[in-house]
Amino acid sequence: MDETLRIAADRMLMRLARWLRLLGADVVTDPALSGAELLRIARVEGRILITRDKRLRTAADVVFVESNAFRDQLREVVVRLGLDPRATPFTRCSQCNHLLIPVARELVTLRVPPYVFASHDRFSECAGCGRIYWPETHPARIRAILDSIGL
């Protein structure tokens, strides 16, 4: 993902926001905020707002997402923003958007299921919420979806 590109996603695009995070994008969300409030925050933080809110479709720094279907939304946003979905995948937490940091295997012994600990050597921890990630948590599924939509 382009390190300078920062995104805000409205509450209608929460699933898309999580997936963009898994692809490495810096995406903030807050389902409690209206589209107009999120747009104001996005402008202060230098972010592009992605939205399905028709009232915001002509505003500057807004990408109106046409499709209702998730896979079409993902393709549309990746193409329109010129994102490379394979450049920095799995570097952000899908839940809270913080960066993932490699963590020593022995530090996650009691934090992952025993079969996961026994079958994996590399782990990452979210710097924000502490969630633990490991290879094959999402990569195979995400790659399959990217392939299925031609990305």
Residue spans of the language-model regions?
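Long, charged N-terminal interaction/targeting segments
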Residues: M1-T88
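Short, structured loop/turn "capping" segments at alpha-beta junctions
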Residues: D84-F90, I101-A104
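Flanking scaffold residues of small Cys/His-coordinated metal-binding clusters
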Residues: A87-T91, A118-D121
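Short cysteine-rich clusters marking metal-coordination/redox-active sites
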Residues: C93-C96, C126-C129
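Short functional micro-motifs and their immediate structural scaffolds
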Residues: H98-P102, W134
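Short linker/helix segments within small regulatory modules
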Residues: L110-F123
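GST superfamily/GST-like fold recognition
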Residues: H138-A140
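Short, intrinsically disordered terminal segments enriched in charged and Pro/Gly residues
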Residues: I142, L146-L151
